Swiss-Prot record:
Residue stretch of the organelle transit peptide: 1-55
Species, as recorded: Arabidopsis thaliana (Mouse-ear cress)
Family: Belongs to the cytochrome c oxidase subunit 5B (TC 3.D.4.11) family.
Single Gene Ontology BP annotation: mitochondrial electron transport, cytochrome c to oxygen
Domain of life: Eukaryota
Region (Disordered): 157-176
Location of this chain's protein in the cell: Mitochondrion inner membrane
InterPro entries tied to this protein: Cyt_c_oxidase_su5b, Cyt_c_oxidase_su5b_sf
GO cellular component: chloroplast thylakoid membrane; cytosol; mitochondrial inner membrane; mitochondrion; respiratory chain complex IV
Listed name of the protein: Cytochrome c oxidase subunit 5b-1, mitochondrial
Keyword check for Cell membrane: no
Gene3D superfamilies: Cytochrome c oxidase, subunit Vb
């Protein structure tokens, strides 16, 4: 419930800022968030009780300095990461649902990851070319060809890199 309320608050805030300055990005806007809220208070629904207390010109100088703690002080973990990303104008799950053309050897399907390897599932192509999902580890610097539909995949690291479990590969020999 909180996530829905805060998410709708952020979308309303972003829409108000964009509407107030159509040629400038949120980060480039120099007016405080409280200015937009005061000018557009009618655009905010009655159920948005979090915004008037948290977004004010006293606590915020620019939208770029807004922190999750100002919007929802109890957010932690993945929820906090999602809210931080939304405040920055990006969606955290953009890398979780890759879309694109069928991957070939010359132009493989690119799958984004925060780490050097990731589990990926291949459902095949469209329509008659679909098959049961084939799950596999996709690793940085290595192409993978689906054994059923021959689609090619490659990993693009967009985060810190390293192993997803936080341990180096050299630790594997100690767990046998």
């Amino acid at each position: 419930m909180w996530r829905r309320i805060v998410s709708s608050q952020l979308k309303t805030l972003a829409a108000d800022v964009v509407a107030a300055s159509p040629r400038r990005s949120i980060a480039a806007t120099t007016r405080p968030v409280g200015f937009y809220l005061a000018a557009n208070r009618s655009a905010i629904s009655a159920s948005s009780f979090v915004i008037p207390r948290r977004f004010s010109s006293d606590s915020v100088e620019t939208p770029a300095t807004k922190k999750v703690e100002d919007v929802m002080p109890i957010a932690t973990g993945h929820e906090k990461e999602e809210l931080e990303a939304e405040l920055e104008g990006r969606r955290l799950d953009d890398i979780d649902f890759p879309e694109g053309p069928f991957g070939t050897k010359e132009a493989p399907a690119i799958v984004k990851s925060y780490y050097d390897k990731r589990i990926v599932g291949c459902p095949g192509g469209e329509g008659e070319d679909e098959h049961d999902v084939v799950w596999f580890w996709l690793e940085k610097g290595k192409s993978f060809e689906c054994p059923v539909c021959t689609q090619y995949f490659e990993l693009e690291v967009v985060g810190p890199g390293g192993p997803p479990d936080g341990h180096g590969d050299e630790d594997d020999e100690h767990h046998h």
